[in-house]
């Protein structure tokens, strides 16, 4: 017989109490641990499907209303992240070039001012 953790890590006390009461009811009814494991597995599967649906909504470039496999959704997500990294890299590169140009210009300006004054 496997041990069941009486309290799962949950954000609120209310959810922990509900979890305990559900476990107590399943023990009192005499349900097997396998049934609880299957229910938990199905719950995780539905959660993952929900996550894939949310990714389809959030990531641009994924055609809405089309049936895509989970692998295809993940590939779109990876491509989108890669595109974001490229854009952020270009922005950082442009900012560093602008900062370099500003520093060169300010150095030239101070040298030019010195020449004018002398």
From Swiss-Prot:
Compartments where located: Nucleus
GO CC terms, sorted: cytoplasm; nucleus
SMART domains per the UniProt record, alphabetical: HLH
CDD domains: bHLH_dnHLH_ID3
GO MF terms, alphabetically ordered: bHLH transcription factor binding; protein dimerization activity; transcription corepressor activity
InterPro entries: bHLH_dom (IPR011598), DNA-bd_prot-inh (IPR026052), HLH_DNA-bd_sf (IPR036638)
All copies of domain bHLH, residue ranges: 32-84
GO biological process terms, semicolon-separated: circadian regulation of gene expression; negative regulation of DNA binding; negative regulation of DNA-templated transcription; negative regulation of transcription by RNA polymerase II; neural crest formation; neuron differentiation; regulation of cell cycle
Keyword entries, A-Z: Biological rhythms, Developmental protein, Nucleus, Repressor, Transcription, Transcription regulation
PANTHER family per record: DNA-BINDING PROTEIN INHIBITOR (PTHR11723), DNA-BINDING PROTEIN INHIBITOR ID-3 (PTHR11723:SF16)
Purpose of the protein: Transcriptional regulator (lacking a basic DNA binding domain) which negatively regulates the basic helix-loop-helix (bHLH) transcription factors by forming heterodimers and inhibiting their DNA binding and transcriptional activity. Influences cell fate decisions in the embryo by sequestering and blocking the activity of the bHLH transcription factors that control these decisions. Inhibits the binding of myogenic bHLH-containing complexes to E-box DNA, thereby preventing activation of muscle-specific target genes. Also inhibits the activity of neurogenic factor neurod1/neuroD.
Subunit structure: Homodimer. Heterodimer with other HLH proteins. Interacts (via HLH domain) with the bHLH protein hes4/hairy2 (via Orange domain). Interacts with stat3.
Protein's recorded name: DNA-binding protein inhibitor ID-3-B
Underlying gene: id3-b
């Amino acid at each position: 017989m496997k041990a069941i953790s009486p309290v799962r890590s949950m954000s609120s006390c209310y959810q922990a109490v509900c979890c305990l009461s559900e476990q107590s009811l399943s023990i009192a009814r005499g349900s097997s641990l396998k049934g609880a494991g299957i229910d938990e597995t199905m719950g995780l599967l539905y959660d993952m499907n929900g996550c894939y649906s949310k990714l389809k909504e959030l990531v641009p470039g994924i055609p809405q209303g089309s049936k895509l496999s989970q692998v295809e959704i993940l590939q779109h997500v990876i491509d989108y992240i890669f595109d974001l990294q490229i854009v952020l890299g270009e922005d950082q590169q442009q900012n560093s070039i602008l900062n370099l140009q500003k520093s060169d210009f300010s150095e030239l300006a101070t040298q030019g001012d010195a020449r004018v004054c002398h």
